[in-house]
Amino acid sequence: MNNSTNSDMSTDLSGPPQVVEHVMTEPDLTYQFGGRYPIAEVRPGQVLRTSTEDCFSGAVRTVDDLPSEVCQQFNPVTGPFLVPGAEPGDTLALHFVEIRPARDWGMSATFPHFGALTATHTTAMLHPPLPEIVWRYDIDTTAGVVRFQARRSTYTVELPLDPMLGTVGVAPAGGEVRASIVPDTHGGNLDTPELRAGTTLYLPVHVPGAMFSLGDGHARQGHGEVCGVAVETAMHVTVAVDVIKGVPTPCPRIETDHQLIAIGAARPLEDAYRISQRDLITWTAQLTGLDLVDAYQLVSQAGRAAPGNVCDPNYTMHAAIDTTALHGATGYHGTHQRLRDLAGRLRTDLCGAAAGTLR
């Protein structure tokens, strides 16, 4: 068996969790990955508690607040956070312990020239662009729902609350700076609904310290984010951090208790699909010892695929497989389970100093 995505150089996570509290303020927000000094340091094995803004920087609060009029930039992230000891060729592991709405409301919108079903600057059409319309959702954390209210009728419906982060990434390689809205191998605006609490995200380390940032909270999002905007809201986030030394990761990956997920980002959409499928097949072969062609066949029959977004500068696709099809194999020498165990030892008041309700 080829365990090239496993490592014996694991951080000792057996002791009491060490928590780093970082209360987010406006200067902590950035709209890029790379090219920025760290705002704080989080060591491998520590747990970060912080907050994030929504993609509108909190400026869209009512259905009358048009983003084109009240927003100067979009998609801020909190960071970057420096991880000492992380070096190019390593893998950064981020286990999301809690992703909790910081407001009791969220916002969504349609934009002219943005979204999967409208003309854009690269998809030229003769028809008029879609109108700019804003929807406000009530978020009920007690009931675990968000409430949709149609703008052009009295139709309402409650949808399950499913908090996630749309944008998480590290500094790109080669000194490059990428806008936070762009997903790629460094992570970024992945918009993958599976990036919820209880999952571990693996990212390649391109620069010393990794320099990770996170944000773009969604109270829920459908696969594909077809109109381009989820139920956007600020979040309180608790994340456990580790570094897998000497083990590279080609593109973002997610591990849950029951599945492995590879994420591809590209245009056209079929290339994002191919990237995600190739990585999942390669990962499957490494974890099981299967020949690549046998792994290809196994993933063809046991795998699943879904879009993350079909509206950003790069599209995202994810390829997933249940670990039961891999005889229970886990990635990165059990890092997900180790971080999950660490999270379980945290005290129950996960809010800590970063808690409260954002205005």
What residues fall within each predicted segment?
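Intrinsically disordered, low-complexity linker/loop segments enriched in Gly/Pro
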Residues: 101-196
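N-terminal, Lys/Arg-enriched amphipathic/low-complexity engagement segments
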Residues: 8-69
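Conserved mixed alpha/beta catalytic, RNA-binding, or beta-rich assembly cores of soluble enzyme
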Residues: 161-270, 281
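A generic structural signal for residues embedded in beta-strands
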Residues: 50, 91-94, 203
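Short, well-ordered loop/turn sites that connect or cap secondary structure elements
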Residues: 42, 83-86, 195
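Short, Lys/Arg- and Gly-enriched loop/turn segments at beta-strand edges
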Residues: 55-66, 99-109, 209-219, 308-310
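Short, structured beta-strand/loop micro-motifs enriched in basic residues and often containing a Trp
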Residues: 23-33, 70-78, 178-186
